[in-house]
């Protein structure tokens, strides 16, 4: 899933996908890519492929706000993402998306309101991730110059906030991931202490039970 796995001519992509599917025991492929790296021909091929094996296309959308996408130099708009997701779903291909919570310039209210746009997309699955600013990157330099633009979450604080996201999220969208933690030596900001994913899930489940809330309980569809 790393990198943009539709960023080649279709003939070369076909050879790569078929090579992966020829490995014994492989029953499908998950293709991570950018929304500006697909077209009708590539999706038509993947639609045919999905008739004989499991195919998932997962788009790195990251934000629904064009100002944010420009600020982090994504090189595409949210409308581009919407078109890619819709073209994929129209072909009955399983489609997922990835979003980052806490991107520079986005308030918590912005993040909560973005769930409405996410709900409007024909997504099967979604992955969320709290912002982590890696050392030695342009974003680290921007953070040093403009720290007020950034929202970092402490672990317990993020669990509470993600409950709010989940309450507003369309109930049929499967959440495949809601957080992650790189080793502290690689990023700046709060460290969650290399907490295990299953521990995060347990914390979220407990908080949902304590608050007596669930995915979609505030969804207005």
Residue map of PLM features:
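Structural motif corresponding to alpha-helix initiation and N-cap regions
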Residues: 14, 39-43, 159
């Amino acid at each position: 899933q790393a990198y943009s796995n539709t960023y080649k001519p279709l003939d070369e992509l076909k050879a790569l996908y078929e090579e992966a599917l020829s490995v014994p025991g492989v029953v499908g492929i998950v293709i991570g890519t950018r929304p500006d790296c697909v077209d009708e021909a590539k999706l038509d091929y993947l639609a045919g492929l999905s008739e004989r094996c499991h195919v998932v296309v997962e788009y790195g959308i990251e934000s629904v706000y064009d100002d944010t996408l420009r600020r982090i130099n994504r090189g595409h708009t949210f409308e581009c993402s919407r078109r890619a997701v819709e073209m994929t779903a129209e072909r009955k291909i399983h489609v997922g998306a990835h979003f980052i919570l806490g991107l520079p310039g986005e308030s918590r209210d912005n993040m909560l309101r973005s769930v409405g746009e996410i709900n409007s997309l024909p997504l099967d699955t979604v992955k969320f991730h709290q912002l982590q600013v890696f050392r030695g990157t342009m974003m680290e330099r921007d953070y040093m110059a403009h720290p007020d633009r950034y929202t970092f979450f402490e672990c317990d604080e993020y669990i509470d906030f993600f409950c709010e996201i989940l309450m507003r999220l369309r109930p049929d969208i499967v959440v495949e991931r809601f957080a992650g933690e790189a080793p502290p030596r690689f990023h700046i900001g709060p460290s969650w202490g290399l907490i295990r994913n299953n521990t995060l899930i347990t914390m979220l489940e407990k908080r949902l039970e304590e608050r007596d809330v669930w995915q979609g309980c505030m969804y207005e569809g």
